[in-house]
């Protein structure tokens, strides 16, 4: 029967081009098309494809949100993000949502076909630019973890209080230390984390899971 595939993209010309090309592949069968996030969620349920080619920016739910919902209900459906965007703000959330592949629309047709086959067989397929973003994020996380390890227990406590939006006076009261001591800790925290102000410190704490987003 071959690979059953659905294309999700809000641009008809993109869907038409993909359908035209994929028809030349004897082992791939396009069984549906969707133009929005809500539509692809419904089609995935109804048609139970082997794989979805998912655009990121669509009306209603975007591709990342749609991927998350589809994977939650049908984890065996494979999803390749096919988009024009390769920035970290798109790549990382897409992979975290459960996407099995991430390709750009400038990909060579033969490479896309190879990606489809690899992903259906249980593999992963990432465009080199997407791989670069993942490696960059991993490297950044390791560097931030190392910076956190440099903080003393008390400095971590102060950082958490900063992330909660407390003033130096409030932090002093919470931790039973003087306001002057708090100021010293804040200066040390900013220096060790290589940050310029309290706002950046608060964002750092939230981003690294030291405190829940307030």
Spans of features found by a protein language model:
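Receiver (REC) domain active-site loop signature in two-component systems and cognate sites
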Residues: 58
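Active-site beta3 strand of CheY-like receiver
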Residues: 47-53
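Recognition helix of helix-turn-helix DNA-binding domains
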Residues: 167-200
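Active-site residues of response regulator receiver
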Residues: 9, 55, 83
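Acidic catalytic/metal-coordinating carboxylates
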Residues: 36-39, 62-65
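Short hydrophobic/Thr-rich beta-strand motif most characteristic of the beta2 strand and flanking loop
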Residues: 27-35, 43, 195
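Short, flexible helix-to-coil linker/hinge segments that flank and couple to helix-turn-helix
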Residues: 89-96, 106-153, 157, 210-212
